[in-house]
Every structure is written in structure tokens, then in C-alpha cells.
Amino acid sequence: MKKVEAIIRPEKLEIVKKALSDAGYVGMTVSEVKGRGVQGGIVERYRGREYIVDLIPKVKIELVVKEEDVDNVIDIICENARTGNPGDGKIFVIPVERVVRVRTKEEGRDVL
């Protein structure tokens, strides 16, 4: 099993969520996060003064999937989150050793 973590633009969340759900990947965790990368910060104005905001609001989507589903999940996220501009995000794939359903204590791939 693998955990897929995708950091994407907030405005792309709904379309990515729908595409994943339509493909059968309904279990996910979504968090509001802030970060920076190549895109750097942005300049905002407040009461006539300019401020550099160096941490940009993003959304993190986390899914645990079967290893054979990882490439499909990555393709779905990329196809639906891409704008072609810096700041589109990153995807991380992390090994998962164990999954346990809290309610029943069942374990393994079947609890996904």
C-alpha cells in the first residue's frame, strides 16, 4: 500500500476530488496548508502598503491506495490540477506498512 500526498492549488480541489471519486477513490483526507517552492511569494497590498507573503495557501490531499493504483491516482491528479504555471504543486508517494480500521480492528488492503 502507498500513501499519495498531493499539494495543489485550492481552486483545483473540487475538480480533483470529483475526478478521484469518479474513478473510485472516495476515501481521502483534505487539509488547508501553506507552503512555498519555485513560485516563491506574492506581493499583497493592505492599507496602501505592500507586504510580501512568502507562504502561499495550498490544499493537501492524502489517499492510501493499493500499489497498483498509484500511477492512475497520480495521472488523475496531474490531469485535473495542472495549470502549466509554477505553483501547480507536488505529489509524494510514501510506503504504508499497516492500515487498521478503528471500528472493527480489521487490517490490510481490504480496509481501504
From Swiss-Prot:
Name the gene behind this protein.
glnK2
The family line of this record is: Belongs to the P(II) protein family.
Q: Does the keyword Nucleotide-binding apply?
A: yes
Q: Which organism is it from?
A: Methanocaldococcus jannaschii (strain ATCC 43067 / DSM 2661 / JAL-1 / JCM 10045 / NBRC 100440) (Methanococcus jannaschii)
Single Gene Ontology BP annotation: regulation of nitrogen utilization
Q: How does it assemble?
A: Homotrimer. Interacts and forms a complex with Amt2.
Alphabetical keyword list = ATP-binding, Cytoplasm, Nucleotide-binding
InterPro entries, alphabetized: N-reg_PII, N-reg_PII-like_a/b, N-reg_PII/ATP_PRibTrfase_C, N-reg_PII_CS
What's the protein called, per UniProt? Answer: Nitrogen regulatory protein GlnK2
- Which residues of the sequence carry a binding annotation for ADP? 29, 37-39, 64, 87-90
Known role: Involved in the regulation of nitrogen metabolism. Regulates the activity of its targets by protein-protein interaction in response to the nitrogen status of the cell. Regulates the activity of the ammonia channel Amt2 via direct interaction.
Superkingdom, taxonomy of origin: Archaea
List, alphabetically, the GO terms of the cellular component aspect.
Answer: cytosol
Name the Gene Ontology molecular function terms of this record. Answer: ATP binding; enzyme regulator activity
| Subcellular localization(s) per the UniProt record | Cytoplasm
- The residues listed in the UniProt record as binding ATP, with positions renumbered to this chain, are 29, 37-39, 64, 87-90
